[in-house]
Regions:
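Bacterial N-terminal signal peptides that target proteins for export
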Residues: 1-11
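Secreted/extracellular ectodomain signature
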Residues: 24-156
Length: 156
């Protein structure tokens, strides 16, 4: 069930990236938790149009949109949502998670960078600093267009 939900979230993100345009845009990553404090779903929102476009959101609105999307897509039982990262900047973003031990709860992080590789490395470094060396994985990646976006995202 979780893999199905994550697949849908990734597909949704891919659609947003395909229709993306330049301009100052907000993005946010949201995680949903059940009554036991275990994460059950994660998604993100990134504006697909520049300021003034139909899908433009600033950082605050992107946070609200990510939470709404999470609640629509999440399975029943989500009792708490958390925005683990949000910004109004241009760049690549990587959402990752890992664990400190076999039965430990997942630790969620978001890395930002000028390339996919930089964003992923920043996310992995955050996991390492938090001691989450087990079951590390990059869950999804996206590119957030900002005011200084002069070129499409690199394919690194």
């Amino acid at each position: 069930m979780i893999k199905l939900l994550l697949g849908r979230f990734i597909a949704f993100g891919a659609v947003l990236l395909l229709v993306g345009a330049r301009g100052w845009a907000g993005d946010a990553v949201a995680v949903g938790y059940n009554k036991d404090g275990i994460w059950t779903a994660a998604t993100y929102y990134s504006s697909s149009t520049q300021n003034g476009g139909a899908d433009y959101r600033n950082e605050a609105d992107a946070r609200a949109a990510a939470e709404r999307d999470l609640m629509k897509r999440a399975s029943e039982g989500v009792v708490r949502t958390e925005i683990i990262a949000s910004s109004d900047r241009t760049g690549h973003v990587a959402y990752a998670r890992g664990k400190t031990g076999k039965n430990a709860p997942a630790i969620h992080v978001v890395g930002y960078g000028g390339s996919k590789r930089d964003a992923e490395q920043q996310a992995r470094e955050q996991l390492e600093r938090k001691g989450a060396k087990r079951e590390q994985e990059i869950v999804f990646r996206y590119f957030s267009h900002g005011a200084d976006a002069a070129a499409p995202p690199s394919k690194k």
